[in-house]
Amino acid sequence: MALIRLGFGRQHFCLLKRRSFLMLKLAALVFAVVLFCEFLIYYLVIFRCDWPEVKTPASDSGQKTLKAMFLADTHLLGEVRGHWLDKLRREWQMERAFQTALRLLQPEVVFILGDIFDEGKWSSSQAWADDVERFQKIFRHPRHVQLKVVAGNHDIGFHYQMNAYKIKRFEKVFSPERLFSWKGINFVMVNSVALEGDGCHICSEAEAELIEISRKLNCSRKQERRSGPCPDPQLLPASAPVLLQHFPLYRRSDANCSGEDAAPLEERGIPFKERYDVLSQEASQQLLWWLRPRLILSGHTHSACEVLHGAEVPEISVPSFSWRNRNNPSFIMGSMTPTEYALAKCYLPYEDTVLATYCVAAGLLVVLILVHSELLPSPFLFGWNLLRKFKT
């Protein structure tokens, strides 16, 4: 009787040991997959990105190079259209991507080209405060890194939705600054939603600001065309500006855009609507005439595109930074001096890569459980038996 009990005890102990070993293997697999998909993959992908080099090295010209990051259309979900799981997944992706980029690339300034929020155009005061708090957590940054934000139509509404309250609410958090100069480089940040051209109060104020900026820029270059006298004791750096805005300048469509992150082929030929998809032709010509930029960066379309205006001014449409808008989000890295610039694109992890990794891991979990339950032969045992049959 004692021997029987001892046998049952050993059998029970072996069963518990096998189960514990299985649970340990399952836990290790789950931990490894989550660690890879939610942390390590961002380092592996962004580590491959590097700052481009300007044609004339800053050390040779005596100019300092500014490292600037440009991203667009983060679209943080609000309380109305934002499902909690969608919020959690997409905001975690952007947080890990942004924090990893800051750590590995160490930019000096980051520009976000509008549509920071998805529901800023209609959110209540409390919802706005909640969205801002989440934004500040996701895009937190060291004090030595500057973060500049341009307003988009989802932040303050389209022209007929925006009002002074929404604009002041936005500028209270992100500053009303329109002209930013650093290391001899001028950046002009335009509220492109206000360039409707219908003479509304907000539009008139925006145009007056741009005319004043144009005067200052012309004075710095000692070209007073349409700018009036130059009494300012402190001139801006004598450098053509970089224009930053949410809406792209006028173009008929994305038909001439190319690349893996351009709009889908079936959408590229769809004509753009002025004042909705792009700025009007009149507003676009005014900006080019007033500011005479050397480079334009914009967002809004969620897809990449490179356009040349007037045969000399390039515009880069920056794709969305969020998985919610694209499977292959990215951002632009710019090495800039007062006279030169070089741009490179840095892709983030593809969403379908992460999902495929989770699916493969789930399949392995099922196989391990079936093998343990003896519902499926061990792969090693199956291979050994197959080899023996082949030999015989």
Curated annotation (Swiss-Prot):
InterPro entries: Calcineurin-like_PHP_ApaH, Metallo-depent_PP-like, MPP_MPPE1, PGAP5/Cdc1/Ted1. One of its GO terms (cellular component) is endoplasmic reticulum-Golgi intermediate compartment membrane. It is found in: Endoplasmic reticulum-Golgi intermediate compartment membrane. Binds 2 manganese ions per subunit. A divalent metal cation 1 binds at residues 115, 153, 246, 300. Its cofactor is Mn(2+). CDD domains: MPP_MPPE1 (cd08165). Gene3D superfamilies: 3.60.21.10. GO terms for molecular function: GPI-mannose ethanolamine phosphate phosphodiesterase activity; manganese ion binding. GO terms for biological process: endoplasmic reticulum to Golgi vesicle-mediated transport; GPI anchor biosynthetic process. PANTHER family: METALLO PHOSPHOESTERASE RELATED, METALLOPHOSPHOESTERASE 1. Interacts with GPI-anchor proteins (via the GPI portion). Interacts with TMED10. This is Metallophosphoesterase 1. It comes from Ailuropoda melanoleuca (Giant panda).
